[in-house]
Amino acid sequence: MENSTSLKQEKENQEPGEAERLWQGESDVSPQEPGPPSPEYREEEQRTDTEPAPRMSPSWSHQSRVSLSTGDLTAGPEVSSSPPPPPLQFHSTPLNTETTQDPVAASPTEKTANGIADTGTPYSDPWESSSAAKQSTSHYTSHAEESTFPQSQTPQPDLCGLRDASRNKSKHKGLRFDLLQEEGSDSNCDPDQPEVGASEAAQSMLEVAIQNAKAYLLSTSSKSGLNLYDHLSKVLTKILDERPADAVDIIENISQDVKMAHFNKKLDTLHNEYEMLPAYEIAETQKALFLQGHLEGADSELEEEMAESSLPNVMESAYYFEQAGVGLGTDETYRVFLALKQLTDTHPIQRCRFWGKILGLEMNYIVAEVEFRDGEDEEEVEEEGIAEERDNGGSEAGEEEEEELPKSLYKAPQVIPKEESRTGANKYVYFVCNVPGRPWVRLPSVTPAQIVTARKIKKFFTGRLDAAVISYPPFPGNESNYLRAQIARISAGTHVSPLGFYQFGEEEGEEEEVEGGRDSYEENPDFEGIQVIDLVESLSNWVHHVQYILPQGRCNWFNPIQKDEDEEEEEEEDEEKGEEPDYIEQEVGPPLLTPISEDLGIQNIPSWTTQLSSNLIPQYAIAVLRSNLWPGAYAFSNGKKFENFYIGWGHKYCVENYTPPSPPPVYQEYPSGPEITEMNDPSVEEEQAFRMTQEPVALSTEENEGTEDEDEDDED
């Protein structure tokens, strides 16, 4: 302590001389090398300029303190020749840059000290040192910072100011050096230990802050299920992979693309099956419709065939229906037109008509109504032959079974046979396809049982002809049969024409009229047309030109009581037993060409509605007829031409919700008789009365038996 106080006094006495020598040295620019700086200057510069260094490298700080202490003791009178220190600045530059910041050249002893310092702190991290320096203890440098901060901010060129600053600085240097020596002598612990603990606390706080920030970025959104951390990672990855120009201008679009990528189907390592979109598949199938041969160089025979072609002018009918607000659109109508041409070219068709379109849940049905030429309907003949063989085989097998098994008392109702081809409900043949360009499929003939059951159920079409129809009552067939039954019902109820367009032939006999009405007609060549206003104002100017379907399921009534010879014999036996045969009245419906004004409505709802296609230009408008019983059925007429069209779900209008019919009554399994008739048990009084009546009878029988035995003994 005595050495430190004596050194402090000498330093205060020598400070004025050191300041004068500094200014003289700068003015004279002596070529000689200046003396080495004082140890106090080196220690103060190291403590102020590189304050974090002792905390990062404890070994270096210890060596520097040892060098400073030994330097103070061995400096001698040469200390007074050291120049005054420059103004201090607050920065954390490494120790090896101190010589460049000092305006006065360093002495060899200072270079040696710097070299020792450099070797003592290898691989120092400036980032860690700067962060640790902010949180280190401040009781070592608080006085130095308070004295040097004003000097560094406001440097004055005045000599007096420099002298005062150097005097105050030297005082603080001595005081700080004394404190360091007192700490080194009084305590054996390292002064850097508090700084190490503070750095560890700072690192732990930094890690916690980083974890909290990352947890916030990883928080999942309640709407999209994404988090910001993954999204930013993907955005940056996409930018670095693609490296677009001016990425900062399109970063919003890149972020949107990254979000949209979540909705795309991710491909795996397996080879996925090539899936053709339905639109492309339909386009491929419809391409064949447009690859038709040109008409250049056509022969005269081809021209005659074109003149007698059975292909209808679908585009003309679509033009009129478009005025009524009904149709499929120009594109689809033209494709249907080409599909009908393909149908007429591949089949011997005499007459063809676009019937309409039935909607389905999965696919729709495009329906074509055709009539084959005479003798060309070979498929129908084959079907009839196969059906007859099945009936004959079934009857033979049934006879064999009847011989073996006892006769059943149950009499099944007679099956109503279907109508022959070209008559009744099977007058026309219908082809369907799901999309124009796909193969046309012929629908089977309809049977009365299918029509009767179709009236009791209501099912949506699926678009697949082989689909099963699950309903109650059970439908006898699949969806193709159900579709054919609905087409027959819709045609019978909605196909109408202007009055006088058709007429009955003169060659038909009167017997047909008496039996069941006429079933054929022909076009009237003398038809002059009806005014459009008359067609709209009166429903009597429209007539049905399709036969009415009877409740039996046929257009022509069939008598189920017609019996063969064997059945007549059985009927005679039943009459002898007293059983009366059943009689069924003949079903009669409205005849052909009956005005639609006689049609029955549903609960004050008329069956038909008429209107003009345009009320603004009535002189060029057409008459439009809409069915209320079959929604989707339309008809138009411009006075001379007419056409019918249907587009809908194939269901009849129902005021109330559909309710399936109730099941039929239970059939009696066994005939009732006295042998199996159950009676109530008698009471006690009834049993006693019965016994009283039975006792005299029993006594009389015993007496009779006794007399008989005596007579036998006498005879013996």
Swiss-Prot record:
Belongs to the flagellar radial spoke RSP4/6 family. Component of the axonemal radial spoke 1 (RS1) and 2 (RS2) complexes, at least composed of spoke head proteins RSPH1, RSPH3, RSPH9 and the cilia-specific component RSPH4A or sperm-specific component RSPH6A, spoke stalk proteins RSPH14, DNAJB13, DYDC1, ROPN1L and NME5, and the RS1 complex-specific anchor protein IQUB. Interacts with RSPH1. Interacts with RSPH3B. Interacts with RSPH6A. Interacts with RSPH9. Its main location: cytoplasm. Disruption phenotype: Mice show hydrocephalus and the tracheal and ependymal cell cilia show clockwise rotation motion instead of planar beating. All three types of radial spoke heads (RS1, RS2 and RS3) are missing in the tracheal cilia. CDD domains: DD_CrRSP4-like (cd22963). GO terms for biological process: cilium movement involved in cell motility; epithelial cilium movement involved in extracellular fluid movement; establishment of localization in cell; maintenance of ciliary planar beating movement pattern; radial spoke assembly. Residues 8-23, 40-52 have a biased composition (Basic and acidic residues). Residues 1-167, 374-413, 564-586, 668-716 are annotated as: Disordered. This is Radial spoke head protein 4 homolog A. It holds the Pfam family Radial_spoke. Residues 58-72, 90-102, 127-141 have a biased composition (Polar residues). Functions as part of axonemal radial spoke complexes that play an important role in ciliary motility. Essential for triplet radial spokes (RS1, RS2 and RS3) head assembly in the motile cilia. The modification Phosphoserine is found at residue 395. It comes from the Eukaryota. GO terms for cellular component: 9+2 motile cilium; axoneme; extracellular region; radial spoke; radial spoke head; radial spoke head 1; radial spoke head 2; radial spoke head 3. Expressed in the trachea, ependymal cells and oviduct (at protein level). Abesent from sperm (at protein level). Expressed in brain, kidney and testis. It is found in: Cytoplasm, Cytoskeleton, Cilium axoneme.
